[in-house]
């Protein structure tokens, strides 16, 4: 008997909705990353993209515990001397709340082609409305 290997063509991709209102940012991001990667499926195969679609609503209402609202920074570097850019979490939430959720999920996925392909299946919205009702998404309790 040989080990089962999932084929990308044989997988059916379902849509899930995660409501981030009042939930910690990290726990919501973990649930989304697990679904995007496909690790919740019994036929998960590490080298095959078996993930599904995820819609995150109310991204602006995600919370952080402790003093992270004041102390958490997102950093990036241009590669040049003095090219460090830092933005405080509360400033990011004031301007682009969906970007904070996107960064949290992105950093939980692998840094390879499967991770980049998984990010294309992530849809983030600040309100309760989304434009994917035609796909009949299922509510996911994270």
Q: What residue spans do the PLM features occupy?
A:
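Ribosome large-subunit tunnel/peptidyl-transferase-proximal elements
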Residues: 1-103, 109-113, 131-142
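Phosphate-binding beta-loop-alpha motif at adenosine-nucleotide cofactor sites
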Residues: 17-20, 121-125
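C-terminal folded domains that constitute the principal catalytic or ligand-binding module
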Residues: 115-118, 122, 128
């Amino acid at each position: 008997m040989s080990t089962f290997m999932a084929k990308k063509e044989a997988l059916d991709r379902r849509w899930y909705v995660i409501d981030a209102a009042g939930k910690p940012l990290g726990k919501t991001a973990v649930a989304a990353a697990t679904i995007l990667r496909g690790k919740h499926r019994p036929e998960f195969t590490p080298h095959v993209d078996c993930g599904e679609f995820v819609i995150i609503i109310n991204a602006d209402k995600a919370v952080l515990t402790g003093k992270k609202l004041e102390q958490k920074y997102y950093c990036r570097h241009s590669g040049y001397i003095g090219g460090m850019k830092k933005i405080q979490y509360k400033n990011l939430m004031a301007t682009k709340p969906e970007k904070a959720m996107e960064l949290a999920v992105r950093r939980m996925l692998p840094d390879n082609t499967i991770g980049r392909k998984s990010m294309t299946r992530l849809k983030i919205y600040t309100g309760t409305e989304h434009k994917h009702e035609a796909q009949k998404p299922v509510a996911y309790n994270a």
